[in-house]
Swiss-Prot record:
The active site is at E230, C264. GO terms for biological process: arginine catabolic process to glutamate; arginine catabolic process to succinate. The keyword Ribonucleoprotein does not apply. Belongs to the aldehyde dehydrogenase family. AstD subfamily. It comes from Novosphingobium aromaticivorans (strain ATCC 700278 / DSM 12444 / CCUG 56034 / CIP 105152 / NBRC 16084 / F199). This is N-succinylglutamate 5-semialdehyde dehydrogenase. Catalyzes the NAD-dependent reduction of succinylglutamate semialdehyde into succinylglutamate.
Length: 471
């Protein structure tokens, strides 16, 4: 029986990008398990040298990789190039993080001998990647996993398999054995089989809350399998007292509409002091009206491209209509710019009057606005979500920011900066439906190896001082 195929298409044109056979989960995992012991036995210095060679391979192939990212995701070429840069930069960050978080340590001990802390790799880790950053985000799991001595089975999103293949080829050209980094092509069925496979020692996931919760439930009875979930957000950006209205508007637009709103840290909700509403919204709308929406390689370069596919675009337009029918007031309508392709104009809607605002991640260029009268109300509204990934305060004074930081429930909290664009040199993750307290980026080293505490003496020496009869 012939194996099914996965086909990826350009969001911008509908043209076929890539096709390939669906992988065999059993074969891929068995190959990884056979390869893992030899990889784990390599000296750390060797593994580090090989991931550095990987960074060099990415540099050499940067133009081709960026072009493929743009074709498969629809993001502008300038943005795809920044993603490739992030892939390269992640290597040295991961090396530093491994040394900082999981290096061998001697510990104080009241006992004779030595107390030590060392780390061991888990074994074979499954990395499940998203489509919005199909190289950078899975790479942020793969590189730390390899440094720690794990083998990796990488399942890219079925919407961006070609980028996943190109990334894996860079690892292989660097000298990392093909069985140590494998790509599993497939859809949700293959992903579920991989997660549940007994030969997988851990799952490192980036994607939607819906899929992450399903993984968590599936593995609830298997506590020995490490699970790191980086999920989405219903992120607030709060605008308070500031005279710098143009800068505030720019930060709002960057937060909401970069990557066509397809970032887990994108601002979904603008919470604004009522007395500032008219002036701020006027500036935001005028700036949003100037946004160029276009294909990845257009000239002049677009600010944002299409969303990933027509189904996603349909869902976003339906969500906008739902908010309108529920009492929302349109500030800037969402428009389908091309009937048969998923190009959407950035949309802004005042939902202050909507009684039951949906607490979901609307993964696209749709910004909801809520007016409030005092700062405590702003904080309460910002926290009015099951998610907890990113939040920003624009304006206010240091005392306001201290209150904001202390009371906001999120893993990333910024002041006068966008909600997106987090540093890879810091931990990255959220709480609630945004993650399971295993932040990625700098702290990825923590879940790629487990700690082993030891007390050690070079010769056995022992005595029992009490509780024994005399000879």
């Amino acid at each position: 029986m012939a194996r099914a195929e996965i086909v990826s298409h350009e969001p911008a044109t509908g043209a076929e990008v890539w096709r390939g056979k669906v992988g065999d989960v059993e074969e891929v995992v068995a190959r990884a398990r056979r390869a893992w012991p030899a990889w784990a036995a390599q000296p750390l210095a060797t593994r580090i040298e090989l991931v550095r060679r990987f960074a060099n391979e990415v540099r050499k192939d940067a133009d081709n990789l960026a072009t493929m990212i743009s074709r498969e995701t629809g993001k502008p070429l300038w943005e795809a190039r920044t993603e490739v840069d992030s892939v390269v930069n992640k290597v040295e960050i991961s090396i530093r993080a491994y040394a900082d978080r999981t290096s061998q340590r001697k510990l104080d001990s009241a006992l004779q001998g030595t107390a030590a802390l060392r780390h061991k790799p888990h074994g074979v880790l499954a990395v499940l990647g998203p489509y919005n950053f199909p190289a950078h985000l899975p790479n942020g799991h793969i590189v730390p996993a390899l440094i720690a001595g794990n083998a990796v089975v990488f399942k890219p999103s079925e919407k961006t398999p070609a980028t996943g293949e190109m990334l894996a080829q860079c690892f292989h050209r660097a000298g990392i054995p093909a069985a140590v980094v494998q790509v599993l092509i497939g859809g949700p069925e293959e992903g579920q089989a991989l997660v549940a496979h007994d030969g997988i020692d851990g799952v490192l996931f980036t994607g939607s809350a819906h899929a992450g919760i399903a993984i968590n439930r599936k593995l609830a009875s298997n506590p020995g399998k490490i699970v790191a979930l980086e999920m989405g957000g219903n992120n607030p950006i709060v605008v308070w007292d500031t005279p710098k209205i143009e800068d505030a508007a720019t930060l709002i637009v960057q937060s909401a509409f970069t990557s066509a709103g397809q970032r887990c840290t994108a601002a979904r909700r603008l919470i604004i002091k009522a007395s500032m509403f008219d002036e701020v919204i006027d500036h935001v709308k005028r700036l949003a009206d100037r946004i160029i929406v276009g294909a990845p390689f257009d000239d002049p370069a677009p600010f944002m491209g299409p969303v990933i596919d027509n189904r996603t675009a349909d869902g976003l337009t339906e969500s906008f209509v739902y908010l309108l029918s529920s009492g929302g007031r349109p500030i800037k309508h969402m428009v389908r710019l091309q009937e048969d392709r998923p190009f959407l104009s950035p949309a802004i809607i005042d939902v202050t009057a909507v009684a039951d605002r949906p607490d979901v991640e609307l993964f696209g260029p749709l910004l909801q606005v809520v007016r409030v009268d005092d700062f405590d109300e702003a904080i309460a509204e910002a926290n009015n979500t099951r998610f907890g990934l990113s939040a920003s305060l624009i304006g206010g004074d240091p005392q306001d920011y201290n209150r904001f930081w202390a009371n906001i429930r999120a893993g990333v909290v910024n002041w006068n900066r966008p909600t997106n664009g987090a540093s890879s040199a810091a931990p990255f993750g959220g709480v609630g439906l945004s993650g399971n307290h295993r932040p990625s980026a700098y702290y990825a080293a923590d879940y790629c190896a487990y700690p082993v505490a030891s007390t050690e003496v070079d010769q056995p020496r022992a005595s029992i001082g009490v509780g024994l009869r005399s000879d």
